Amino acid sequence: MAKRDYYETLGCDRGADDTVLKASYRKLAMKWHPDRSQGNGEAEVMFKEVNEAYEVLKDPQKRAAYDRFGHAAFENGGGGGPGFGNDFASSFADIFDDLFGGAMNRGRGGGQQRGRGADLRYNMEITLEEAFSGKTAQIKIPTSVSCETCSGTGAKPGTQPKACRMCGGAGKIRHAQGFFTLERTCPNCQGRGSVIEDPCSDCGGAGRVTRERNLSVQIPAGVEDGTRIRLGGEGEAGVRGGAAGDLYIFLSIEPHTFFQREGADLYCRVPISMVTAALGGTVEVPTIDGDKSKVKIPEGTQSQKRFRLSGKGMPIMRARNHGDMYVQVVVETPQKLTKRQKELLAEFEKDSSGETHPESTGFFAKVKEFFQGAAGEGA
């Protein structure tokens, strides 16, 4: 009996692109899948036809050959069409992978291929003082580690993985189809060439188990909020003896009650009395290293004046110098004055001149000029 046209089988025209072909294939494969139509002989036949058609049309080379020669391109003496013979199991595996996310292959004793372990992330919060001095932190992380019972092989102690019968240990399956020789990854062993018939009882054949590990992490001085520290090989254990992933420590710095940080510089606000601002003096301010520094306040200091303490900021990573510390003074206005204090301030105000309050005098002079000018324009 003549075979149906592959495009007709999938319900697509000859100009259909890969997206259209795949969408049609998925729809029909779901419709005719044997698990959904048990006992329906027609469904099994249709499922095989859909699979065969898609196996050819999804491959650019095979599709080109089919478009030119038709079914004759795949005749090979034995009459087996594409997707059958040794490659038939592979075709079914592809369908299950496409429809069910690879669950079929995961249940086949082959397990996963050898591969690198996943990277891990660990969030750590430190204080500004710890960022200044650096620290050694002890952390605990739950992670997959290589199974000690089977040394990461996944096989029961005393046994070894055996060569895959489907591919003969090659990890690939070759199949001649007309003018072409096709090569596929073996669906039974997922390309490893071996399968585990007696899995390790501790790891179930995975080669890895979950454990909590204690690690020592060195935090260098001068780290900033958002700094990322990489610990090579401290991530998830590799699959079946593969290389371990990395561990990334992401740092965040707690807000400080006194200091604000901008890069390597520190900023703080210090209140001073009106008398100190007027007469001058010295104030002591705490520094991030736990010490204190004296700041000289000159006579007539205005509120919000900023003073710089060189080298009193944060250490600069990979350098020997430090940032600076900036002290902004805030002049406090006294509250709840006694009668005597009010009298003294009133007397001070009467005795004040333009030189005592240069900014205020200049301000009111400008206001006076403005109103006088406005009155002259209106006359």
Swiss-Prot record:
Annotated CDD domains: DnaJ, DnaJ_C, DnaJ_zf
Positions annotated to bind Zn(2+) 2: 164, 167, 186, 189
Residues the record lists as binding Zn(2+) 1: 147, 150, 200, 203
Organism the protein comes from: Xanthobacter autotrophicus (strain ATCC BAA-1158 / Py2)
Major subcellular location class: cytoplasm
GO cellular component terms, A-Z: cytoplasm
Biological process per Gene Ontology, one example term: DNA replication
Family: Belongs to the DnaJ family.
Co-factor binding comment: Binds 2 Zn(2+) ions per monomer.
Cofactor: Zn(2+)
Domain text: The J domain is necessary and sufficient to stimulate DnaK ATPase activity. Zinc center 1 plays an important role in the autonomous, DnaK-independent chaperone activity of DnaJ. Zinc center 2 is essential for interaction with DnaK and for DnaJ activity.
Segments annotated as CXXCXGXG motif repeats: 147-154, 164-171, 186-193, 200-207
Gene label: dnaJ
Location of this chain's protein in the cell: Cytoplasm
Protein name: Chaperone protein DnaJ
